[in-house]
Amino acid sequence: ATVTATTPVAAHPHVWIDAAPEVIFDEQGRVAALKMRWTFDALYSSFALSGIDANKNKVADPDELAMLAKQNTDALKDFKYFTLVRKNGENVPFGEGVSAENIVVDGALVMTLNLPLAEPIDPAKHHMSFASFDPTYYIAISVKDASAVSVVKAPAGCAAQYSEAGEAPQNVSDSVVNNLSDNWAAQFAPTITINCNG
């Protein structure tokens, strides 16, 4: 029941995620990593949690949650973890050490992805932004508003700026999605820009 698995639904999106990103700075005032906290919708959460219940005790045990986190991390690698980071308009790769943890909160599956950048970015010197989206639009990822974004160890004068995107359409047919460009879903993804005025 990985996040990229198909389900028998005729229209996109199939899964909904509420995202709460954290921007992690290092001691040099550079952005070193992103931490993406994803809360899955009730239907997918139920489906995924029942699918990992190997011992049939109707409880998501720590080892079962860890197994699902590993499966999702492996599956998301080819999709760049549904997270596009840009430095001066150029795509930035993630580095080694990507990891994930799962917990259950009020019945909802919550996955936290730890995404270290291949090279830290100094947002005082470079324009940096990121957005989260599934290019296949199988999954709709939303960042509620600016309050959902946080920064950790940010230097004085550095903050995350939230820019709303266009309202994402619902019930897009599979046949339509299959003929869309890879960048189509990006237009519905809120963009987070890191501004440093200090």
Task: Identify the residue ranges that each predicted region occupies.
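Mature, soluble, non-transmembrane domains
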Residues: K87-G198
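Short, hydrophobic/aromatic beta-strand segments
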Residues: A33, S46-S50, P123-S129
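Domain-scale selection of a single, long terminal region
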Residues: A1-T2
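Early extracytoplasmic/domain-onset interaction patches
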Residues: H12-F40, Y44
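Structured domain cores in non-transmembrane regions
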Residues: L43-E119
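Boundary at the C-terminal end of the N-terminal hydrophobic targeting segment
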Residues: A5-A11
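Residue-level detector of beta-strand face positions
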Residues: E22-V23, L84, S129
